[in-house]
Amino acid sequence: MAETNVVLDAIRSRRSCRAYEGEMVPKELIETVAEAGTWAATGMGRQSPVIVAVTDKAVRDELSEMNAKIMGTTSDPFYGAPVILIVLALKKRPTHIYDGSLVLGNMMLAAESLGLGSCWIHRAKEEFETEEGKKILEKAGVNGDEYEGIGHLALGYPSYEEKPKAAPRKPGYVKWVE
């Protein structure tokens, strides 16, 4: 394998976590993960995304119910994670989906580097198009008519004994023009 450093190590070792302990993550660690998201590249540096950190259990559970309903299940789509970081981005920016996706990627790598588990959970777009979703955003000072949900980051301490193994990288993943 090629050269290594702490960034490449985090990239190679990160896995989606689908089992969490109930213990709340300290606010300082949540802030560190969220701050990593703010350093993501954005189209023309316009920083279209916002991050809504949810640590209130009642709101977290409400989001879980909404998300599960969209998915057509009754199980917790956040896998028991105590913290949900919601990424939304300004709809009027043509790069908003890409911008928000990079924010989520940065936060997943930061979580890995801090020994936290994380998992990107979809259906944020559908969730925050509803009046119920917009009311939740309003609590955080976000106008749900101007922002589109990009994704949720479930965040917490992993409850598994051993991290899942990565699937081998597929052959021909990288193509060259030399």
Residue ranges with predicted function:
Residues 1-178:
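Acidic, surface-exposed loops and disordered segments
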